[in-house]
Regions:
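Intrinsically disordered, low-complexity serine/threonine-rich segments
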Residues: 5, 9, 18-21
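PLP-dependent amino-acid enzyme catalytic core
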Residues: 15-444
Length: 444
C-alpha cells in the first residue's frame, strides 16, 4: 500500500553527509572502477564463489534469444547486497583498522549483508530496525550476524530507525554503512559486472538491471564502460517507486511524494546521489517501469516453471522481457535476479495480485433480491469453470435488495465476459470493482 516517505523505503537512507566524488558534474574526480571492482571481486572470493550465470532454456525459447540469469539470489544472504557491505567494510578497515563498530538502518537485504560482513571481519554491528519489522527478517539477520550483531528495534517507521542510527553513530563514533549511496558500496556491487564478463567470456548484447537506490545499476554500468564493453542496458523500476525516472526528468535526484512498498527491495523514494552521478547520462527510454501486479505474475511463473524463488525486486529484470521481446530477438541478454529473500507468508497476496492482473479473478458487488431462491438463481448462471473465492452478504430486513461482495476465479479471461452476459440476461444488477485500488487494497 502506498505511503508518504521522507527519503525512501526499507533500504533507503536520508542524504546525510553525501559529497559525491565520482563525476565531474559534481566537482570531483572520476574513480577507476575497473581496478577497484576487480579488487572487490577478488576479496569476495574468500567468502563465496561467483554466483551462477545460467542460460535459461525456457525464456530463451520463448523470446528467440540467449537469456542468461545472473543468480544474485544465490549469494550466502540471498541477495547482491553482501557485495557492497563487505567491500565498504573492507575499505574502511584498510584505512582505519581500529574501527570497531558499524551501523546500518534497514529491515531488508542490506541489514543481512551488513550482519554477514560484521561476522566475517569480527567487528561489532548495530542494526536499527523499525518495531514493525517482520520476525522472519529479524531472525535471518541474527542468523547471519551471530554474536557480532546487536539488533535494536526503534520506531514504527524506517525514518525513525534511521534517525536513531545516525544519533548512535554521532554519540559512539560508529561508522554508518549506506545501502547504496557510497562509492565503496557501488564498487562492491560492480563485482557483479566483473563476474558476468568472466563467466560469459564476452560482453552480452544487453544487460537488464533492477533499480532501487541505484547502487547495483551504477556499479555494473560503470564497470562495463570502464572496460569498453559495448552492451546495451535496460533499467527496471517498480511503477510505484520510479526514483530514477523522476531524477532523469529534472537532472537531479528527487524525493517521490509516495512510494508503493510492495517491491520492498526497490521501493526507494529518492535515488542515491552518488548512484545518479553514474547514471545521469543514460537515455530516459532505457528505463522501464514494472507494475507491481505484473511482477507477481512473473514471480509465480519463475516459481512454478523454473523452481526459482525470487522476491519482488529480484523478479524485476525478468518481468520486462515481454516488453523487450522485439529488441532482444537473436541477442544475448543477461538479467540480474537481485534477490530471493521472499517470505512465503506473502504468497497468498502474490497469487491474488497475479490473478487479478491476468484477468482470472474479479470482484464485484451484486444487488441480490431478498427473496427465497435468489441466491440459487445466481448460482445457476455460474459456468463450469467459475469458482466462488469470496462471498460476503448481510441480509437487510427493511430492504428489498441486499448487496453481496463476490470474488470469482476462473481459468480463462473469456469466462467473465460470458458470465456477465448471463447475469445481465437474468436481470442481476452488478458493479465490477476489480480495478478499484482502494477496495482492492482492503480485500487483498
Amino acid at each position: 500500500m502506498p505511503h508518504a516517505p521522507s527519503a525512501g523505503g526499507d533500504d533507503t537512507v536520508a542524504q546525510l553527509r553525501i559529497f559525491p566524488r565520482v563525476c565531474p558534474q559534481y566537482g570531483c574526480d572520476m574513480t577507476d572502477i575497473r581496478d577497484s571492482a576487480r579488487s572487490a571481486t577478488q576479496a569476495l572470493r574468500s567468502l563465496f564463489e561467483p554466483t551462477p550465470l545460467q542460460r535459461n532454456e525456457h525464456l530463451s525459447a520463448r523470446y528467440g534469444a540467449d537469456i542468461w540469469l545472473k543468480r544474485e539470489d544465490l549469494t550466502p544472504v540471498r541477495s547482491y547486497k553482501i557485495r557492497g557491505a563487505v567491500n565498504a567494510m573492507r575499505k574502511v578497515l584498510a584505512q582505519t583498522p581500529d574501527q570497531e563498530v558499524f551501523v546500518c538502518a534497514s529491515a531488508g537485504n542490506h541489514a543481512q549483508g551488513v550482519a554477514f560482513a560484521c561476522r566475517h571481519f569480527g567487528k561489532r554491528g548495530v542494526i536499527f530496525m523499525p518495531v514493525t519489522t517482520p520476525r522472519q527478517k529479524i531472525d535471518k539477520t541474527r542468523i547471519f550476524g551471530g554474536d557480532a550483531v546487536e539488533i535494536r528495534l526503534t520506531g514504527d517507521y524506517f525514518d525513525q530507525s534511521l534517525a536513531a542510527a545516525q544519533a548512535y553513530c554521532a554519540a559512539e563514533g560508529a561508522h554508518f554503512l549506506s545501502p547504496f549511496d557510497d562509492d565503496d558500496v557501488i564498487e562492491g556491487q560492480a563485482s557483479v559486472a566483473v563476474e558476468i564478463i568472466e563467466q560469459l567470456g564476452q560482453a552480452p548484447d544487453m544487460v537488464v538491471l533492477p533499480v532501487g537506490g541505484g547502487g547495483l545499476a551504477a556499479g555494473v554500468r560503470s564497470y562495463f564502460r570502464a572496460v569498453d564493453a559495448p552492451s546495451d542496458f535496460r533499467y527496471v523500476e517498480p511503477l510505484g517507486g520510479a526514483s530514477l525516472t523522476a531524477a532523469l526528468k529534472v537532472g537531479a535526484p528527487q524525493t517521490l511524494p509516495r512510494v508503493d512498498s510492495f517491491v520492498d527491495g526497490a521501493a526507494v523514494a529518492r535515488i542515491g546521489t552518488r548512484s545518479f552521478a553514474r547514471l545521469s547520462d543514460i537515455p530516459r527510454s532505457s528505463v522501464l517501469l514494472a507494475p507491481e501486479d505484473r511482477i507477481c505474475v512473473t514471480m509465480l511463473e519463475m516459481l512454478n516453471v523454473e523452481g526459482i524463488v525470487l522476491e519482488p525486486a529480484g523478479a524485476l529484470a525478468v518481468d520486462v522481457l515481454p516488453v523487450l521481446a522485439d529488441q532482444i530477438r537473436g541477442k544475448s541478454v543477461v538479467c540480474v535476479t537481485s534477490g530471493g529473500n521472499f517470505d512465503f507468508e506473502r504468497l497468498p497476496e502474490v497469487k491474488e495480485r497475479a490473478l487479478r492482473f491476468s484477468g482470472l479473478k474479479k470482484y464485484f458487488i451484486l444487488r441480490l433480491p431478498q427473496r427465497p431462491g435468489a441466491l440459487r438463481d445466481f448460482l445457476g448462471i455460474l459456468g463450469p469453470d467459475d469458482d466462488i473465492a469470496r462471498f460476503e452478504y448481510l441480509k437487510k430486513s427493511a430492504r428489498n435488495f441486499g448487496s453481496v461482495l463476490i470474488g470469482i476465479e476462473t481459468n480463462s479471461t473469456d469466462s467473465f465476459a460470458a458470465l456477465f452476459r448471463r447475469m445481465e440476461d437474468a436481470g442481476f444488477d452488478y458493479r465490477d470493482i476489480t480495478e478499484d485500488e482502494t477496495l482492492a487494497n482492503f480485500l487483498v
